[in-house]
Amino acid sequence: MAQIGRGEMTDDTHGGGLDWLLDELLCRLSRADRAIVLSADGLLIGRSSNMSRDEADQLSAVASGFQSLSRSTGRYFGGGAVRQTVVEMENSFLVVTSAGSTAYLALIAAADADMGMVAYEMNLLIRQVGTYLSSRPRGDVQMTGAGRGS
């Protein structure tokens, strides 16, 4: 697992004050490795400092795709709104959770991670900064308010 350090953030980070919160989340979850926040359409909003921009963009695209498939499945089969998508792989989990009205928190955790604690900590972070995590889709051309561009 990668070592997490606050001094590793690069200049192209767009998460502002969000990135350090993702780092803190990973510090609380010893078996979690990477975390991002993304918009519903896959735009990267913030990333943990142990991720390169390219790696975070890739995870953002994957997480957005899984959430889209999950939402479609929920609608088609009457399952309702998607609260969380979990992908179990041989060596890790991908967990994607709704974070605000149009944003998601995605996290990679080791296969032996305590998934109850992962879900708890992710939801705790979302409750603490929920309105900050909300994001407008890129395609919304009627966006109003100064300084809210992507």
Walk through the language-model features, giving the residues of each.
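Acidic, low-complexity cytosolic segments
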Residues: 2-34, 41-150
